[in-house]
Regions:
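Active-site rim/loop-helix segments in enzyme catalytic domains that contact anionic ligands
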Residues: 1-81, 206
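Metal-dependent de-N-acetylase/amidase catalytic core
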Residues: 69-216
Length: 216
């Protein structure tokens, strides 16, 4: 939904896959203009720095008005970028935008393969859709060891200075859930998921329905 969401939930996975030579990208739906701290311009610059740290091949911001999302724009982005795997925020989250983003992404992934929907653009079927955690975490269906790239995730998150800098006496930043211990929460969560698979750090992902594999 917003710049920094993907880094919070899947920064390690993105860094790991980018380092392995896979083409990794992010589509931000909004510029987060309703955020308490920072401006759209600051958030854009921060996301560009984070993308560089992670080694992303592409980052697109659809520029949808914050708190409103458009399925058609996302379907067009999916058909243009043709991703094999799509990640979206988990459907159970305290932030309504994350819930809306989860729903519209699921709808767009489904609609992108329909030849009679937006027939001016060639349809495309996404291989897999998984959901990452932002403000909480249930028991994940999949856990990916990101220990070897965790420092890259930390660096990428620190690029979002406007969101994670604690409020001071100068009034530059106001207190929000993101700048009052949030990064500690993220790291604790990733350690906890890592413990489930005997790793120092791991990121968890959820799936709706069985995950198809050829062999165990």
């Amino acid at each position: 939904a917003h710049p920094d969401d993907a880094e919070i939930g899947a920064g390690g996975l993105m860094a790991k896959y980018a380092a392995a030579g896979l083409r990794v990208g992010v589509v931000d739906l909004t510029q987060a203009e309703m955020s308490s701290n920072g401006t759209p311009e600051i958030r854009q610059a921060e996301s560009e720095r984070a993308s560089s740290v992670l080694g992303l091949a592409v980052r697109v911001n659809l520029g949808l008005p914050d708190r409103t999302f458009a399925r058609e724009r996302l379907v067009r982005a999916i058909r243009e970028l043709r991703p094999r795997v799509v990640l979206a925020p988990h459907w159970d989250d305290r932030h309504p935008d994350h819930v809306a983003c989860s729903r519209i992404t699921e709808e767009a992934v489904f609609s992108a393969k329909l030849r009679r929907y937006l027939p001016d653009v060639e349809p495309f079927e996404v291989g897999r859709l998984y959901f990452y955690f932002i403000n909480g975490w249930a028991h994940p269906d999949i856990a990916v060891d990101v220990t070897d790239v965790y420092e890259i995730k930390r660096r990428a998150l620190r690029c979002y200075e406007s969101q994670f800098t604690p409020p001071g006496t100068d009034g530059r930043y106001v207190a929000t859930p993101l700048n009052t211990g949030y990064l500690d929460f993220v790291e604790t969560r990733d350690r906890s998921v890592g413990r489930l698979i005997s790793a120092e750090y791991a990121e968890g992902f959820a799936a709706k329905g069985p995950v198809r594999v050829e062999r165990l």
